[in-house]
């Protein structure tokens, strides 16, 4: 039957997404101009935020770049922000864009070493609780000195590596180098249950690791971009920052790790999945086969990757350059010394990060709408006019709520600027300023684990190649992050109230 042009256009719009989803996006695009005229730009601005969050929540139905991008373009056309405003937001976050372009690609060229190390760990450590603690604590420790996105890229690379190894074996195609692990058509029926259990197992580890990046990232000056911003305004160096934040960050870290143990013991919130024995055997055999196949050339590659990994950690820990530029150095070193000179081989490394980079620019457009329309101003004004003794906890709560919706750096910038202005005007003391700065820092970092749009690392995980493989949806991430959200928010809030 011949398809009409209008039918073809309808089918092409958002590709293979469900019809209801296409209709919802079209409804958004029709409602928005009407809302601007009838409800005004302020209310419509909040409508745009809700619509964008919806596209993130439906990431498994359609990659958010397309529907979210259409909404962002319309925001500019309707005058809720300007192209200059978007450019300003993008320019302000250029270091994050550089990081995604180059650092994530750099990690791609380290995947052999990462799989080698983590495979040994997974095969040798039998206790799921111990493995979960290792993932969470390692992510926290690394995120205290490296960028959370870099650490998340490592977790994703390891997860995809494990999944592809088992998926090949479960399909009876262990020797097929071109096997597509995104398709389950070839999975042998006997392996279906183990595959689903392995998915749950990897999902648990990735969520523990992702939350670990927040646990570590809050504690040091270089842990998160907003930490640098707050420290600069407050005039704190690395040691000052750590000591000021420690009364909150250290108890939160301890309680976060305790939460890992409780979740794995109780199997609450969909945690507690075990590594099936058949999967462990396959990973064990894979390790033995890889060890037997190792030539001097392969060993040389692993040595180079190990050396470059050390250079990477030292470069980021001492902040010798912007993270993205360090990532570019990693790409050059690994490809040069491991003989990867084919353009197409190099190109594969950028496939994972560039769609997310584009999505992040779309996100910055929504942040620009928030900025231009002063959508957060009423909340900011309420907190700033509260009694002095209740301000720290209210700053913590307000920053947490707003950071779960918007960009952490944007929220931190708004609040720390207002608090600094109050200090300069003599309205608050230096001691109170330091307390509020810690409340702002911990507020933007801890409760924001509630949603994927609250943490760039979470959003990266949600929109990465591994999310559909492990059936990790927006709703699933929110559900699995919920116990952490409660623990981090309550413990963080109590520490801000009583320990500062």
Curated annotation (Swiss-Prot):
Any one Gene Ontology molecular-function term assigned to this protein's record: sodium:proton antiporter activity
Superkingdom assignment: Bacteria
Pfam families: NhaB (PF06450)
InterPro entries to which the protein is assigned, alphabetical: Na+/H+_antiporter_NhaB
Catalysed conversion reaction: 2 Na(+)(in) + 3 H(+)(out) = 2 Na(+)(out) + 3 H(+)(in)
Subcellular location: Cell inner membrane
Assigned keywords, A-Z: Antiport, Cell inner membrane, Cell membrane, Ion transport, Membrane, Sodium, Sodium transport, Transmembrane, Transmembrane helix, Transport
Transmembrane segments: 13-33, 34-54, 62-82, 97-117, 129-149, 242-262, 306-326, 350-370, 392-412, 449-469, 477-497
GO cellular component: plasma membrane
Predominant subcellular localization, coarse grouping: membrane
The keyword Transferase is annotated on this UniProt entry: no
Record flagged with keyword Manganese: no
Record's bilayer topology term: Multi-pass membrane protein
Protein family per UniProt: Belongs to the NhaB Na(+)/H(+) (TC 2.A.34) antiporter family.
Entries under HAMAP family matching the protein: NhaB
Biological function: Na(+)/H(+) antiporter that extrudes sodium in exchange for external protons.
Name this protein carries in UniProt: Na(+)/H(+) antiporter NhaB
Gene: nhaB
């Amino acid at each position: 039957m011949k398809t009409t042009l209008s039918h073809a256009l309808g089918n092409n719009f958002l590709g293979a997404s469900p019809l209801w989803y296409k209709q919802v996006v079209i409804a958004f695009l029709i409602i928005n101009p009407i809302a601007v005229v009838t409800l005004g730009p302020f209310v419509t601005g909040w409508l745009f935020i809700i619509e964008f969050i919806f596209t993130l929540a439906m990431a498994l139905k359609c990659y958010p770049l397309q529907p979210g991008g259409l909404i962002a373009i319309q925001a500019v056309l309707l005058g809720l922000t300007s192209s200059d405003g978007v450019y300003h937001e993008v320019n302000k976050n250029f270091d994050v864009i550089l990081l995604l372009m180059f650092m994530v690609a750099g990690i791609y060229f380290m995947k052999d070493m990462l799989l080698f190390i983590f495979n040994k760990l997974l095969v040798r450590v039998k206790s799921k609780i111990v493995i979960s603690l290792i993932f969470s604590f390692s992510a926290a420790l690394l995120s205290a000195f490296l960028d959370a996105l870099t650490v998340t890229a490592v977790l994703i690379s390891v997860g995809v590596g494990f999944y592809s190894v088992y998926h090949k074996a479960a399909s009876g195609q262990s020797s097929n180098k071109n096997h597509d692990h995104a398709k389950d058509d070839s999975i042998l029926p006997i392996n279906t249950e183990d595959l689903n259990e392995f998915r749950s197992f990897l999902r648990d580890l990735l969520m523990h690791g992702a939350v670990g990046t927040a646990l570590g990232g809050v504690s040091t000056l270089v842990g998160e971009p907003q930490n640098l911003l707050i420290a600069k305004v407050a005039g704190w160096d690395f040691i000052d920052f750590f000591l000021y934040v420690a009364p909150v960050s250290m108890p939160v870290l301890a309680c976060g790790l305790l939460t890992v143990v409780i979740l794995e013991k109780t199997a609450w919130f969909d945690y507690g999945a075990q590594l099936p024995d058949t999967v462990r055997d396959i990973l064990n055999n894979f390790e033995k086969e890889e060890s037997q196949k190792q030539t001097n050339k392969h060993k040389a590659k692993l040595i180079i990757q190990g050396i470059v990994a050390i250079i990477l950690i030292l470069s980021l820990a001492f902040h010798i350059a912007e993270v993205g530029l360090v990532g570019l150095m990693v790409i050059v070193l690994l490809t040069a010394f491991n003989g990867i000179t084919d353009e197409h081989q190099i190109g594969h490394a950028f496939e994972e990060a560039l769609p997310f980079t584009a999505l992040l620019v779309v996100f910055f457009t929504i942040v620009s709408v928030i900025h231009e329309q002063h959508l957060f101003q009423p909340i900011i004004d309420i907190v700033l006019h509260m009694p002095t003794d209740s301000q720290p906890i209210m700053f913590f709560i307000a920053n947490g709520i707003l950071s779960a919706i918007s960009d952490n750096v944007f929220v931190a910038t708004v609040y720390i600027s207002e608090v600094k202005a109050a200090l300069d005007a003599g309205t608050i003391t230096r001691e109170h300023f330091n307390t509020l700065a810690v409340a702002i820092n911990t507020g933007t970092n801890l409760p924001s684990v509630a949603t994927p749009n609250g943490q760039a690392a979470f959003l990266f995980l949600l929109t990465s190649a591994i999310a559909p493989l492990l059936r990790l949806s927006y709703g699933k991430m929110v559900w699995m992050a919920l116990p952490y959200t409660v623990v981090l928010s309550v413990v963080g809030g109590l520490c801000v109230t009583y320990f500062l």
